[in-house]
């Protein structure tokens, strides 16, 4: 078989087999090559000559094969065949040698196979390969000596077969320790026919071309040989590097890792808090015009508050204090120059307003709808402004402050009222001639005198009405007629004792709402009645004589007296 070592056979057996092959040749003429047919009737003399040439050719072929193997090993030190079954691809016009011309000897008699089981225990595969190569050389030499030579063609075929045996042995030596080596006895006739048929292929392919193809296939199947590349284009160091083994980490490295993890966790928490704060805040508004497709709610425009510069409205009867001149212009335009054209539709109201929003705000006061509830005391209000002012009572906040005296208050109206006190010359034109206190109205001055200076009030009344007699019992009534009351001999009307008071004749008795005040004036008595009337005269337990006056005589009005009576405390 090709690729296996053959044992030498004795010359007698070879001659017998050659004779049998010659006898069987005429039976199958189509399978024998023309050279063998022509050489059959040549006789014993020609066969002896051929055998002598064969011996010399076989020896030369063995030497050439050894030289070729050494040269190939030197050129390709790493070359090996992956598997013995790998063969070069068949040429389309060429058939395999075994299938082309089966010899008649194969049909009659199969070669003997000697299978030896070889166990390698401690030997290296390379050493085994060298031993096999050394043992193969004398076997090939003996085979070549026993066979007749047919020329240079047979030497080429022996070289190729020797190469196959080397490849199979090298592959077997690398597979494992347990190897099976099969040897067969050589058949000379079969080898001769095979050699003759190699050169009669229908495609006309020579043995040199076949050897080149085999070498190319073997090189392609083997690993890429090492080549010195000056440009280092084929060098890939990352493939040759081995993965570094993981080193044991020390305690310091673990501590650093833990610190890094803690820092990362803290950073994550801080970022989450920042995101929450950003979510609470309003998103920044985009610049540019608003798209028609944009249906997001519009945010109210915010104007920057100007710096505080208090100014006062100089319009007659106003005196409103404003925080900036710009606000003053707005105030004058809408509060003094603009006409009131919006009328309240409520039947009992009819108030006029300059702006529609003022009318809508006022219309809520005519309803009982209170949508704004205090969270502290659950009190309800009709407007958010009233609720905000009320909430300051619970919080104790007083945002407004007077720049002159530091007075604080919650509402702007309170501050405006307070600021008028600092401008007494312009606003407080009426003053008390006794103490010098100033008032906005004249009636307030009269009420002040009746409360704080009653003796002056009575003296003025006596001076203005001295000796005048009032005979009308209904002084403040609607009947203007004077009625004559029963009187004593002097003609003075007899009046009942006012409030049943009895005092000494040296005191002036004033009574108002059950509160009495006395003033020493000899025998005369002045009494301020509960209905607002004044009695001046002398009174005793036996009878009373005097003058009954109305408060209008003193220049005061009943409105002032009523306002003064409602006020609590001095």
Swiss-Prot record:
Residues 1-12, 119-128, 224-245, 252-269 have a biased composition (Basic and acidic residues). One of its GO terms (biological process) is activation of NF-kappaB-inducing kinase activity. It is found in: Nucleus. It is an enzyme of class 2 (transferase). Pathway: Protein modification; protein ubiquitination. Its EC number is 2.3.2.27. GO terms for molecular function: ubiquitin-protein transferase activity; zinc ion binding. A zinc finger (C2H2-type) spans 311-336, 342-366, 372-394, 400-422, 430-453. Residues 31-43, 59-68 have a biased composition (Low complexity). The modification Phosphoserine is found at residues 83, 103. Residues 1-306 are annotated as: Disordered. Pfam families: zf-C2H2. Keywords: Metal-binding, Nucleus, Phosphoprotein, Repeat, Transferase, Ubl conjugation pathway, Zinc, Zinc-finger. It catalyses: S-ubiquitinyl-[E2 ubiquitin-conjugating enzyme]-L-cysteine + [acceptor protein]-L-lysine = [E2 ubiquitin-conjugating enzyme]-L-cysteine + N(6)-ubiquitinyl-[acceptor protein]-L-lysine. Residues 69-82 have a biased composition (Basic residues). In contrast to other E3 ubiquitin-protein ligase, does not contain any domain (RING-type zinc finger or HECT domain) known to mediate E3 ligase activity. PANTHER family: E3 UBIQUITIN-PROTEIN LIGASE ZFP91, ZINC FINGER PROTEIN. Atypical E3 ubiquitin-protein ligase that mediates 'Lys-63'-linked ubiquitination of MAP3K14/NIK, leading to stabilize and activate MAP3K14/NIK. It thereby acts as an activator of the non-canonical NF-kappa-B2/NFKB2 pathway. May also play an important role in cell proliferation and/or anti-apoptosis. This is E3 ubiquitin-protein ligase ZFP91. It comes from Homo sapiens.
């Amino acid at each position: 078989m090709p690729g296996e070592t053959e044992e030498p056979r004795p010359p007698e057996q070879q001659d017998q087999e050659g004779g049998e092959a010659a006898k069987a040749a005429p039976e199958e003429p189509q399978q024998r090559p023309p050279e063998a047919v022509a050489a059959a009737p040549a006789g014993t003399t020609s066969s002896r000559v051929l055998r002598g040439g064969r011996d010399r050719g076989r020896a030369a072929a063995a030497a050439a094969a050894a030289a070729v193997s050494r040269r190939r090993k030197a050129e390709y030190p790493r070359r090996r065949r992956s598997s013995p079954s790998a063969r070069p691809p068949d040429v389309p016009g060429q058939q395999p040698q075994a299938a082309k011309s089966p010899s008649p000897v194969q049909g009659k008699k199969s070669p003997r196979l000697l299978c030896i089981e070889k166990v390698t225990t401690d030997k290296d595969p390379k050493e085994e390969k060298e031993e096999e190569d050394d043992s193969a050389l004398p076997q090939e030499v003996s085979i070549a000596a026993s066979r007749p030579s047919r020329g240079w063609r047979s030497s080429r075929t022996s070289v190729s077969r020797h190469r196959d045996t080397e490849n199979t042995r090298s592959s077997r030596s690398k597979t494992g320790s347990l190897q099976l080596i099969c040897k067969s006895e050589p058949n000379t006739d079969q080898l001769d026919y095979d050699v003759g048929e190699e050169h009669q292929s229908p495609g006309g392919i020579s043995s040199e071309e076949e050897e080149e193809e085999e070498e190319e296939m073997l090189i392609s199947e083997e690993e890429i040989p090492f080549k010195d590349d000056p440009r280092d284009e084929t060098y890939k160091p990352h493939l040759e590097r081995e993965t570094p083994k993981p080193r044991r980490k020390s305690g310091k490295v673990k501590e650093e890792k833990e610190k890094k993890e803690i820092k990362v966790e803290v950073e994550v928490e801080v970022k989450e808090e920042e995101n929450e704060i950003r979510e609470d805040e309003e998103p920044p508004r985009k610049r540019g015009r608003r798209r028609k497709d944009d249906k997001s709610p519009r945010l109210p425009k915010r104007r920057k508050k100007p710096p505080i510069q208090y100014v006062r409205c100089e319009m007659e009867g106003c005196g409103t204090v404003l925080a900036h001149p710009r606000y003053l212009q707005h105030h004058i335009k809408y509060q003094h120059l603009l006409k009131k054209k919006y009328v309240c539709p409520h039947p009992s109201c009819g108030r006029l307003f300059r702006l529609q929003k003022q009318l809508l705000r006022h219309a809520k006061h005519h309803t009982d709808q209170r949508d704004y509830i205090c969270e502290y005391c659950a009190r309800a209000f009709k407007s958010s402004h009233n609720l905000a002012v009320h909430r300051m009572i619970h919080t104790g906040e007083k945002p407004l402050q007077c720049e002159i005296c530091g007075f604080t208050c919650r509402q702007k109206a309170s501050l405006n009222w307070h600021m008028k006190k600092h401008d007494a010359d312009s606003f407080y034109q009426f003053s008390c001639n006794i103490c010098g206190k100033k008032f906005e109205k004249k009636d307030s001055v009269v009420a002040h005198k009746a409360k704080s200076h009653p003796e002056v009030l009575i003296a003025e009344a006596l001076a203005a009405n001295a000796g005048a007699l009032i005979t009308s019992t209904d002084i403040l009534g609607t009947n203007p007629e004077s009625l004559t009351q029963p009187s004593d001999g002097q003609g003075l009307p007899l009046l009942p004792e006012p409030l049943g008071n009895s005092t000494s004749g040296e005191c002036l008795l004033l009574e108002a709402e059950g509160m009495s005040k006395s003033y020493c004036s000899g025998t005369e008595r002045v009494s301020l009645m509960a209905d607002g009337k004044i009695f001046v005269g002398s009174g005793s337990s036996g009878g009373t004589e005097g003058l009954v006056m109305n408060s209008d005589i003193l220049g005061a009005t009943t409105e002032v007296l009523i306002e003064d009576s409602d006020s609590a405390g001095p």
